[in-house]
Amino acid sequence: AVQAARAYVTHPRFIEAHRLSPYPFRGTDVSVVLDVMIHDLDLVLALVRSAPVQIDALGVAVLSPSEDIANVRLRFASGCVANLTASRISDESIRRIRLFQEDCYLSIDYKHQTVELARKAGRAIRRQTLAVTPRHPLDDELTAFLHAVRTHRPPRVSGEEARAALALALKIERVMRHVRYGR
């Protein structure tokens, strides 16, 4: 779904991501930021192509010792603002990212593998559903990685990009700790 949308992403101004799921009873030794939100952080960094300059974050531990729900607001040097929510204590599973820019609005639903595009057409709004080939993202990531190893070509996500997403996730955790404990 993301691949179908990428061709339309030019200069994001606002991004909103929701990645919610029921309690997993596994992986609760790390916060929802490292377990769940990191996937959206990686995608947002790739789409915005700008450094975050401000981080506001709040996380709450509800059923496990680490944060089970978190919300972060990122302001980027480009002026883009991204608001991300991740939860592993939701009643339903939602995996969606919405992207707003001056010429269009994109809604990407990972779970249902759909992409909707809305554009201004004169005095009307033209909506279209983009063609998406249903795929399993984890299988795609592993296949792409194996292909990179076998062919000695760069992977789809470089080590630097993965490290940047991890570094941002760790900064978010520090901000959440500071808000929660004042340190």
Say what each PLM segment does.
Residues 1-27:
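A contiguous active-site-proximal alpha/beta segment in oxidoreductase catalytic domains
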Residues 77, 144-183:
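C-terminal helix-rich "cap/oligomerization" subdomain common to oxidoreductases
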Residues 2-5, 84, 172:
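Hydrophobic packing residues within well-ordered alpha-helices of enzyme cores
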